[in-house]
Amino acid sequence: MAAAAAPRGWQRGEPRALSRAVKLLQRLEEQCRDPRMVTGPPSLRDLLPRTAQLLGEVAKARREAREDPEGPGGADDFLAIYLANLEVKGRQVAELLPPRGKKDVNQDVFREGSRFRRQLAKLALIFSHMHAELSALFPAGKYCGHLYQLTKGSAHIFWRQNCGVRCVLPWAEFQSLLCACHPVEPGPTMQALRSTLDLTCNGHVSVFEFDVFTRLFQPWPTLLRNWQLLAVNHPGYMAFLTYDEVQTRLQAYRDKPGSYIFRPSCTRLGQWAIGYVSSDGSILQTIPLNKPLLQVLLKGQKDGIFLFPDGKKHNPDLTELCRVEPYQRIQVSEEQLLLYQAMNSTFQLCKICAERDKDVRIEPCGHLLCSCCLAAWQDSDSQTCPFCRCEIKGREAVSICQAQERPTEVRTAADGSRDNCHQEAAEQKLGPVIPSAPSLLPEDQFPQGPQDKGWLTLAPLALPRLRPPLPLPKMASVLWEVTSRPRAREEATESS
């Protein structure tokens, strides 16, 4: 029997490239042993060995791979781009650090506020992004970029419709695809968009980077408008800034409570970190959990917490972005209602506690449960969905009620308030989610089949199938509304 063919990349010299990258990281790790290199997150001393270990796992998995199902934009292309970028960024770090055995050279890199220190901090952030990206697309070394589930449903549909199973695209191609849905003027604005999206600074956009971007600048219908107001025009936005640098920058405003700046979190990619001066002059940093930044800033302004962006008097008005989204509807068939009734239950009842109604939706898998059960589940250090074991990347407060039938033209008018690209995307199903463990708790979902015809599919949810014990006759469906509603969400203080 002939031996199984190795992946194409493995045959083209990929093993040597991976080995060379690991050796480079090991050399950099030796240069970072100076005690003065101990900094807040992200720390090169921590990132370099972790990245080297993950690359070793990738090499092992690639060596043992029996087939190579990925085409253009798959594992081969991603690794070629990743390793080339790693070599470039690694050399830049090596030039900034003192050579081995010459500790008296390049001393400016250890001086707080120096240009060399700032360059090193930015490179540490890039290495942090690269490690997070590799971990997301190659968990435990095994490629799963073609199965990657974006957190926001509309973003997932956009990527899979336009990019298929590819996990990485050249910037020029991605730019044209995005602009077809969200137009952007060429020139400085387009360049600013590239610098925000391209977290690893390699001239490409991966599905992971797009996921982070869409989580930061949600909701989808006004994605780039949100980005322009928050990242381009807002004086409080800081790109590529670390926890320590935020503390340093706000020192100048300790006598001006209400001063604040915000940045993408480097420890929780896809979420925001806000640094601000409290009423007693303390400098605090917090990460709002699963809530759009513009809502957090507006509430902070109302409460007198976020008043002076980067110490400036003018606080931009973000109210134009806080519009109520149209209701998101899901459909429950009559047979499903009968099934719930047979179990002495209802659709809206949380299937974990069986006491409270569902009021929160887990992202990206879309499962519904009550916020109390979700909080208790996460307090037990469980960061995966209790139904499908998909990673919990976000959550959305919802309100469930049985809807009254509306005339078709009225329903269409409400739905039409979303942009065309969003409307088209909403008519497609989400891609598959591969759970890491079997479900342990009851599951909810609606059956797929011929009876689905005519159902509204705005913002469809990827939920597990609920199978009835006996076949039931097809009956008319009943419309339910799952309504996103604003509610206060807890905030977590960033401790690292």
UniProtKB/Swiss-Prot annotation:
Modified residues (Phosphotyrosine): Y340
Activity regulation note: Phosphorylation at Tyr-340 is necessary and sufficient for the activation of E3 activity.
Reactions mediated catalytically: S-ubiquitinyl-[E2 ubiquitin-conjugating enzyme]-L-cysteine + [acceptor protein]-L-lysine = [E2 ubiquitin-conjugating enzyme]-L-cysteine + N(6)-ubiquitinyl-[acceptor protein]-L-lysine
Binding site for Ca(2+): D198, T200, N202, E209
PANTHER family referenced in this protein's UniProt entry, alphabetically: CBL, E3 UBIQUITIN-PROTEIN LIGASE CBL-C
Miscellaneous: This protein has one functional calcium-binding site.
Zinc finger map (RING-type): 350-389
Reported modifications of this chain: Phosphorylated on tyrosines by EGFR. Phosphorylated on multiple tyrosine residues by SRC. Isoform 1, but not isoform 2, is phosphorylated on tyrosines by EGFR.
Lineage of source species: Eukaryota, Metazoa, Chordata, Craniata, Vertebrata
Any single biological process term in GO: negative regulation of MAPK cascade
Keywords (A to Z) from UniProt: Calcium, Metal-binding, Phosphoprotein, Repeat, SH3-binding, Transferase, Ubl conjugation, Ubl conjugation pathway, Zinc, Zinc-finger
Domain called Cbl-PTB: residue spans: 7-320
Domain notes: EF-hand-like and Sh2-like domains are required for N-terminal inhibition of E3 activity.
Stored Pfam families: Cbl_N, Cbl_N2, Cbl_N3, zf-C3HC4_3
Renumbered residue ranges of the record's region Interaction with RET: 350-494
Species of provenance: Mus musculus (Mouse)
Protein name as catalogued: E3 ubiquitin-protein ligase CBL-C
